[in-house]
């Protein structure tokens, strides 16, 4: 029988529930258990696909094409289970499905209410994510996860928020139905240090647990976040006023790398408490690979700096998976990768010289016209000065636009996203494609923004003799999230000018990778997909590994010139 661990948060948001949940999952997996994670988001958006990165951070794309919360990226990087559409759902999805059922008459004329209809729907979504299907049409509609031993369910938001109440009530009911040996509650809270008083304050934690108990939930474990280890005296005080056993009050202090958190939680007995509560007999945890990973992170042999030219630079969460993928590749090369954000809105031909100090340049994905000319400047500077360049999604498109303007003689080349009536639309809207499941998707300029992009895992053929072929072999399969592509009408003109189309889909002839020959540039690649979503700290990713290797070579060359 599948066991459930519910992870909630209190006092303030952004405490790291996702990292805590993923760390617990990693420890349980090291004990031989099959684990999955499910994220419940209380906002009314159907998914985060149309939300601003400044509001939400990165949108993580799963293999099956779901646009999900960035925490699912942490989940995939911490455990071996791959996330699916069923691993993340929102209030918007829940209410939408309830209202559709009401319109169909599924409720047989009953008054539709938050309790029981919305809370029952939440429970069904949770169970599907844990591999427990309901044998209804919703199983096919939303997908069902693989059966697991333990499902860790992270409830977004903060206890006390109005939006979270139906979710908390739903998991309270679910825990009652399943029994105390099949469910556990872990509550992440905040213990602030007041500098003027010179002490940690436990009152906010007492109040957030009181709020949970009013709802009918008694936490089994408290993860107490602070900027320092919490002394035993304060832990005893928290235990007394929250009715949580002392050994269940765990100190979680700030760490210089998230990969230290599994060891931190294990050494304080979190996994042992959960296994005892859920009556799970397992082998001892083995975190040796986490220890090796932390050692690699803390003892790099070399150091490089990457310039990331984007417009969401004020919030690093906008590029969370990308940042991690670069660091993973650095680990593979025993190198520390520093990432310096360059605001593309301020980048002009006159200021482009500031890019000369970097070991490589990267233009990430994005949407909209704002900052686009600065990204084109970054691509041009990298091409003209032999600096390793990686363009991802929009980054490939701006590299194509730049090459069309300055090498293919297509003055005014642009994307129809930014200039619908431009003279040379070298990037244009995709109107038809075939998904991995064989279904044909069609779109036009009047399609809704939400859920209408080319999403999820897609495959393409790789041209022999290219850098792309060295990295991927004959076929590349990566996750996508875009609605614009290189215009097929201009491909021959671009190739005649020297741009290499190194990966292309069989059916639609959509351009997936472009590059420059090694004889022209040491490492210049653009990809239409998002390889960062498949990178892990254990294996890295071959594209990023090749990119970082080129950056290290460029760094060595710069040092040699300076000597």
Swiss-Prot record:
It comes from the Bacteria. GO terms for cellular component: cytosol. Mg(2+) binds at residues 71, 154. UTP binds at residues 13, 201-206, 237. InterPro entries: Class_I_gatase-like (IPR029062), CTP_synthase (IPR004468), CTP_synthase_N (IPR017456), GATASE (IPR017926), GATase1_CTP_Synthase (IPR033828), P-loop_NTPase (IPR027417). Allosterically activated by GTP, when glutamine is the substrate; GTP has no effect on the reaction when ammonia is the substrate. The allosteric effector GTP functions by stabilizing the protein conformation that binds the tetrahedral intermediate(s) formed during glutamine hydrolysis. Inhibited by the product CTP, via allosteric rather than competitive inhibition. GO terms for biological process: 'de novo' CTP biosynthetic process; pyrimidine nucleobase biosynthetic process. Residues 305-557 form the Glutamine amidotransferase type-1 domain. ATP binds at residues 14-19, 71. It catalyses: UTP + L-glutamine + ATP + H2O = CTP + L-glutamate + ADP + phosphate + 2 H(+); L-glutamine + H2O = L-glutamate + NH4(+); UTP + NH4(+) + ATP = CTP + ADP + phosphate + 2 H(+). The active site is at residues 393, 530, 532. Pathway: Pyrimidine metabolism; CTP biosynthesis via de novo pathway; CTP from UDP: step 2/2. L-glutamine binds at residues 366, 394-397, 417, 483. CTP binds at residues 13, 161-163, 201-206, 237. GO terms for molecular function: ATP binding; CTP synthase activity; glutaminase activity; identical protein binding; metal ion binding. Keywords: ATP-binding, Glutamine amidotransferase, Ligase, Magnesium, Metal-binding, Nucleotide-binding, Pyrimidine biosynthesis. Catalyzes the ATP-dependent amination of UTP to CTP with either L-glutamine or ammonia as the source of nitrogen. Regulates intracellular CTP levels through interactions with the four ribonucleotide triphosphates. Homotetramer. CTPSs have evolved a hybrid strategy for distinguishing between UTP and CTP. The overlapping regions of the product feedback inhibitory and substrate sites recognize a common feature in both compounds, the triphosphate moiety. To differentiate isosteric substrate and product pyrimidine rings, an additional pocket far from the expected kinase/ligase catalytic site, specifically recognizes the cytosine and ribose portions of the product inhibitor. PANTHER family: CTP SYNTHASE, CTP SYNTHASE-RELATED. Belongs to the CTP synthase family. HAMAP family: PyrG. This is CTP synthase. It comes from Leptothrix cholodnii (strain ATCC 51168 / LMG 8142 / SP-6).
